[in-house]
Amino acid sequence: MKMNKLVKSSVATSMALLLLSGTANAEGKITPVSVKKVDDKVTLYKTTATADSDKFKISQILTFNFIKDKSYDKDTLVLKATGNINSGFVKPNPNDYDFSKLYWGAKYNVSISSQSNDSVNAVDYAPKNQNEEFQVQNTLGYTFGGDISISNGLSGGLNGNTAFSETINYKQESYRTLSRNTNYKNVGWGVEAHKIMNGWGPYGRDSFHPTYGNELFLAGRQSSAYAGQNFIAQHQMPLLSRSNFNPEFLSVLSHRQDRAKKSKITVTYQREMDLYQIRWNGFYWAGANYKNFKTRTFKSTYEIDWENHKVKLLDTKETENNK
């Protein structure tokens, strides 16, 4: 029988917000611009930029595809955002007796925003809408005259008139993708835990049982094990909750040629870590999940040179937000 000595959680004792931010040096790698002439109308310019936060274990890999189309009166940039966002997973202490906790990667957010007034707008993006598939796959195609098409799969929807195409392909087991804060200046996505199987599941971040609370990662309701050993095995947790998320998102930006030749964009990668805890009340185990308990955000700001089809990393910023 477990002793009925319960350790008060940090949630109950303090919900104060700790905000820590820092501006890192604007260091990164940018590849030389490669040029590909499709025909007498369309020329493609491609460069890749990387920026990392070693502190947060977040890596941004951005591929800039400039499309110069003589049959279209605007410049087009297809930006592919890839890289890595670590979950921030912290495993429980196996020696915890009647109360224990872990931190897990519950949601990953990516956004691309234009900092220009009206010269640069976001005109398309992928993926769109809500997507609960295990594997998300889209193909973007550009045809002469500025026509953009986005189709499901890695090749569907392309035809002989396609001057440029780009694909995205990522896995999100037990998670789902949502569009967020999307307008003509910003496109964003959130990949969040949705249906996690654990015995009586599926469970989510907000699941609740009147007796056992949120059993998201609880191994046994009546287990005689120590608290720190009464979580499901780490390998049974979804990969995104305990390891890394490898994003692949597309944004299409349009630039008016009669306006400023340079503009700025900001790319944001973020993880939301939830606090999950279990406690013994003398009769059974109960779990609780506290959403967005720790947030780690990494931003990079780039200057886009539309005339010369180049990019320059201006600044990076790391922000911590703890409850």
UniProtKB/Swiss-Prot annotation:
- Give the GO terms filed under biological process for this record: cytolysis in another organism
The protein's GO terms of the molecular function aspect are: toxin activity
> Would you say which domain of life the source belongs to?
Bacteria
Key words, A-Z: Cytolysis, Hemolysis, Signal, Toxin, Virulence
Instruction: Name the Pfam families on file.
Output: Leukocidin
Show which residues constitute the signal peptide: 1-25
Q: Which GO terms describe its cellular component?
A: extracellular region
Subunit details: Leukocidin consists of two protein components: F and S; gamma-hemolysin consists of two protein components (H-gamma-I which is identical to F and H-gamma-II).
Q: Could you tell me what this protein does?
A: Leukocidin causes cytotoxic changes in polymorphonuclear leukocytes. Gamma-hemolysin causes hemolysis in red blood cells.
By sequence similarity, the record places it as follows:
Belongs to the aerolysin family.
Name listed for the protein in its UniProt record: Leukocidin-F subunit
Native organism is Staphylococcus aureus
Specify the taxonomic lineage.
Bacteria, Bacillati, Bacillota, Bacilli, Bacillales
